[in-house]
Amino acid sequence: MEEVLEQLLAYGLYTGLIEKEDTIYCYNSLAGLLVFEPKACNEEHIKEEIKNLKTEERESGEYLEKLLQKILDYALAKGIIEDDSTITKDLFDTRVMGVLTDRPSNIRNRFFEKYSSSPKEATEYFYQFSQDNDYIRRYRIKKDIRYKVESPYGELDITINLSKPEKDPKKIALLGKTASHSYPACMLCKESEGYFGRLDFPARENHRIIPVKLSGENFYFQYSPYVYYNEHCIVFHEEHKPMKIDSAVFGKLFSFVEQFPHYFLGSNADLPIVGGSILSHEHFQGGNYSFPMEKSGLREEFSLEKFPDLHFGIVNWPMSVIRLNGKDKERCIDAASFILDRFRSYSDESLSILSHTGDTPHNTITPIARKRGELFELDLVLRNNRTTEEHPLGLFHPHEEWHHIKKENIGLIEVMGLAVLPARLRTELSNLGEAILENKDISSDPVLEKHYNFSQEIRKKYQNITKDTVEEIVRAEVGKVFLMVLRDAGIFKEDEAGKEGFRRFIASLS
């Protein structure tokens, strides 16, 4: 085991996680974690390992994955960990990487030192660090299926997320027998930095966060461990308080992109169904990525009397999006607040858009901010979370016919044109492709039956499906389902009635 620890220390030195002076300290700490009396650390062996380390192995995370697997095998054999479930192993190998992860104060000092030269240099450092210390598990991320599909709005991004660990049924059963916890209050709380974890809360010994001020309020910046797109970051409030879309949010989004102009930042909506999975803690998501919606041009331009100095338009997109931009940040915030206030109380019964049911509000906005040179830009995606008898999960939500592919909420990431699809689809779509090739009836298959209508449509549409083309065809059709999902979520549809309805709303802003 000494040799494996020396290889891990070589990795730590090579990546800059630790320095030469930390070697013996880390070696002893790791030996203590693994409960064995070590021989003296062989520093010559470490030097040799550093020479042999291949850049591509480091960058893919493969070298680290192999070392951690050896450590986990040892821990299991010695009874240090009780089983080989993903949850148990993740709790332990995160403790291991915590030994190689510097204290928060040092990481923050390094970040701001780099920031003083260049915000981009600072984020590149922090993103690389978050990968090197295994907070972002690159060897899992690369398992995700990612591809693009053509649409009338440009390319859409499709991902089938395989890197998020599946919940272990045995561990779920155990949870019912364990005491409930209130610390940390949620996975976004600042108190999760360095937290040791438990069955229902991932270990965070290698987790580091960077303080940022947004409109004078204290926030923290981190990367998502699941990286749905390049440099996928999360910016969360220092207090555990609910999401709320208001004029202050627009100011916070712009405050961030002013400080990090190479990143966008957006917020999920603040209502159930159209919001994200965490409404209890104010947070935003951003990153260094151009989404399909950002690349899409304007379908129509318009002006508002109150804001002659700003540009406005309707984005050519399946959802209902107003884009505004201008040089004056405060004017952009005022315009966005004005549109939000008007939309909160706006109804159009002819299009089934009702602002309230009794005292329950339905209208809100998903905002996304960017900096384009001197211009501040904001996309305002109009959302409504009404439910009906026919659509009990949401009228402007994926309709039931698409649930075989996507039934979860359409949050910020999907709104912008990136489908995050469940892991079950990897196997299901592969098996569906085989069934189509073999002309199998799947109507009574307990797993594939949900895809029956989808498969029939594919069979009708494509005459000559071969082993070489079936995967590409199924993937393209999944992309079309995602497009339909986005259309369902749009409140002003793309037919003439919908376009006229959108124009009526714009006219109401004058």
Predicted features by range, described:
Residues P272-S280, G358-T364:
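Beta-rich nucleic-acid/ligand-interaction surfaces
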Residues F219-S224, V249, L253-V257, S303-L310:
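Structured alpha-helical segments in the cores of large, soluble enzyme domains
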Residues G61, N230, H262-F264, S277-L279, ...:
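Coil-to-beta-strand transition motifs
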Residues M1-P242, N316-P318, C332-A336, R342-S510:
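Active-site microenvironments that recognize anionic phosphate/pyrophosphate groups
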Residues N206-R208, E238-L265:
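Helical scaffold of the NTase/Pol beta-like nucleotidyltransferase catalytic core
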